[in-house]
């Protein structure tokens, strides 16, 4: 039970750090983080479309983030690395944050969702799903789903191949939850066969039957 409590505590801590970094690094195109314990302390990898913003002028911002992760969140000797997101349109976290920002700017939820889906698919995604939950049009909360293309929903492919991201939009009517799921262009399903070129081969009489 002690081990279970430890992992629950660590999971909650990582979630709180993710929420903090999302707010601090929205202008950097924040796309999530990875936390790993090492013999020397804690390695924190921040994924961002604009690494320069995370680092800051003269390294000022990354030093401040390091201090906060250690003092406020209790990470042992945090070492921050920043990894650039090559294509932000295929990172679900980046897209969730951008969609939340669009909603906060007053763009209608349907227009914002369709615009995001078109941009994601134009960048080669095999499929995308967007779920918006909250008071979208009035006092009554509801959930709306938008999708296009193919997206693995269950099993190992859904867990390992699909990029998922979550963000929140703070509106006058309340908080809107934004969930984005993206199937990237290079996702290969276990039972999928892809033939790029026409193949010609001889077949024996027995095989032909």
Swiss-Prot record:
<keyword id="KW-0694">RNA-binding</keyword>
<dbReference type="GO" id="GO:0006412">
    <property type="term" value="P:translation"/>
</dbReference>
<keyword id="KW-0689">Ribosomal protein</keyword>
<feature type="domain" description="KH type-2">
    <location>
        <begin position="17"/>
        <end position="86"/>
    </location>
</feature>
<dbReference type="Pfam" id="PF00189">
    <property type="entry name" value="Ribosomal_S3_C"/>
</dbReference>
<comment type="subunit">
    <text>Part of the 30S ribosomal subunit.</text>
</comment>
<dbReference type="GO" id="GO:0003735">
    <property type="term" value="F:structural constituent of ribosome"/>
</dbReference>
<dbReference type="Pfam" id="PF07650">
    <property type="entry name" value="KH_2"/>
</dbReference>
<dbReference type="GO" id="GO:0022627">
    <property type="term" value="C:cytosolic small ribosomal subunit"/>
</dbReference>
<comment type="similarity">
    <text>Belongs to the universal ribosomal protein uS3 family.</text>
</comment>
<dbReference type="InterPro" id="IPR036419">
    <property type="entry name" value="Ribosomal_S3_C_sf"/>
</dbReference>
<dbReference type="InterPro" id="IPR015946">
    <property type="entry name" value="KH_dom-like_a/b"/>
</dbReference>
<dbReference type="InterPro" id="IPR027488">
    <property type="entry name" value="Ribosomal_uS3_arc"/>
</dbReference>
<protein>
    <recommendedName>
        <fullName>Small ribosomal subunit protein uS3</fullName>
    </recommendedName>
</protein>
<dbReference type="InterPro" id="IPR005703">
    <property type="entry name" value="Ribosomal_uS3_euk/arc"/>
</dbReference>
<dbReference type="InterPro" id="IPR001351">
    <property type="entry name" value="Ribosomal_uS3_C"/>
</dbReference>
<comment type="function">
    <text>Binds the lower part of the 30S subunit head.</text>
</comment>
<dbReference type="InterPro" id="IPR009019">
    <property type="entry name" value="KH_sf_prok-type"/>
</dbReference>
<dbReference type="InterPro" id="IPR004044">
    <property type="entry name" value="KH_dom_type_2"/>
</dbReference>
<dbReference type="InterPro" id="IPR004087">
    <property type="entry name" value="KH_dom"/>
</dbReference>
<dbReference type="GO" id="GO:0019843">
    <property type="term" value="F:rRNA binding"/>
</dbReference>
<keyword id="KW-0699">rRNA-binding</keyword>
<keyword id="KW-0687">Ribonucleoprotein</keyword>
């Amino acid at each position: 039970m002690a081990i279970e409590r430890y992992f629950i505590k660590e999971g909650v801590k990582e979630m709180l750090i993710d929420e903090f970094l999302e707010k601090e690094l929205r202008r950097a195109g924040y796309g999530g983080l990875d936390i790993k314990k090492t013999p020397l302390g804690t390695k924190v990898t921040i994924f961002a479309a604009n690494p320069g913003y995370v680092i800051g002028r003269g390294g000022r911002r990354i030093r401040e983030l390091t201090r906060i992760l250690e003092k406020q969140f209790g990470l042992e000797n945090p070492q921050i690395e920043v990894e650039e997101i090559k294509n932000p349109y295929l990172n679900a976290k980046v897209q969730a944050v951008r969609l939340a920002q669009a909603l906060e700017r007053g763009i209608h939820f349907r227009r914002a969702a369709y615009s995001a889906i078109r941009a994601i698919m134009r960048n080669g995604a095999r499929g995308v799903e967007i779920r918006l939950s909250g008071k979208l049009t009035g006092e009554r909360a509801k959930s709306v789903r938008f999708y296009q293309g193919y997206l693995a929903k269950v099993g190992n492919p859904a867990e390992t191949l699909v990029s998922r991201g979550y963000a929140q939009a703070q509106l006058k009517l309340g908080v809107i939850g934004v969930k984005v799921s993206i199937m990237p262009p290079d996702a290969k399903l276990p039972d999928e066969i892809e033939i790029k070129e026409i193949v010609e081969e001889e077949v024996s009489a027995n095989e032909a039957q």
